[in-house]
A protein has these predicted regions:
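Flexible active-site lid/hinge loop adjacent to a nucleotide/diphosphate
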Residues: 1-46, 153-157
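Short, charged/polar "capping" segments at the starts of alpha-helices
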Residues: 39-44, 63, 182-185
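Residue-level signal for inorganic ion chemistry
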Residues: 15, 34, 66, 101, ...
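Generic beta-sheet signal
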Residues: 36, 56-60, 175
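Nucleotide phosphate-binding/pyrophosphate-handling subdomain across enzymes
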Residues: 73-74, 82-186
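Extended acidic/charged loop-beta regions that coordinate divalent cations
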Residues: 1-8, 21, 43-88, 125, ...
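A short helix->loop->beta-strand "cap" motif at the edges of active sites that frequently abuts
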Residues: 26-32, 50-54, 170
Length: 186
């Protein structure tokens, strides 16, 4: 959890409890949970999953393994191993953070018995969500312009680090604003 939405929940404890409510009360026995084992809340999610007999999957699992990751201009090339088959996938999204979301979606889809061949064929056609690493243009000096509504210190840092990693050979300029008075702690 980050500072995002704490203004609504009043404090981190309430925010965490609202998130855990999803696992404790809304997922039925035998349901699927796909999560990141690197988040601080993982142990709590794991314990709830064990208690409720939920099927827990993380990014580190025996079903999918990322073999390699490379950048190719504005795209990312992923090699994923699944059941002794290697799939090379072009991801036309900026930001390494996007890969985590894609892999979790692939795991969830696979565990929901959706056709992986179709899923892998659709990934190259994905485009950014409006306001999330969204390419909005190019200026005269050939600089790329991206829009991201990162509005917490953690989100802004993740955004900048992802852009820097993918475009390490380019100069990066950042323009950000903090409008509104809803959560002055941000």
């Amino acid at each position: 959890l980050t500072q995002d939405h704490v203004d609504y929940h009043k404090n981190f404890k309430n925010y965490l409890n609202a998130k855990l409510y999803l696992f404790q009360n809304l997922i039925k026995k035998g349901g699927i949970v796909v999560t990141d084992d690197k988040i601080p809340e993982f142990t709590k999610i794991k314990n709830i999953s064990l208690k409720k007999q939920l099927k827990l999957f993380t990014l580190k699992n025996k079903y999918f393994q990322i073999l390699s990751h490379n950048y190719k201009n504005e795209a990312q090339i992923l090699k994923i191993k699944h059941k002794n088959l290697i799939h090379e996938i072009r991801v036309n999204l900026v930001g390494k953070i996007q890969l985590k979301n894609i892999l979790m979606a692939v795991i969830a889809a696979s565990k929901s018995n959706l056709d992986l061949k179709k899923i892998f064929s659709v990934i190259p056609r994905l485009s950014s969500v409006e306001g999330r690493f969204e390419k909005i243009g190019k200026i005269k000096n050939k600089s790329l312009v991206f829009l991201d509504y990162a509005h917490s210190p953690d989100a802004l840092q993740t955004c900048i680090l992802n852009i820097r990693e993918q475009f390490s050979d380019r100069h990066i300029s950042v323009l950000f604003g903090c409008g509104g008075d809803r959560d002055k702690g941000k």
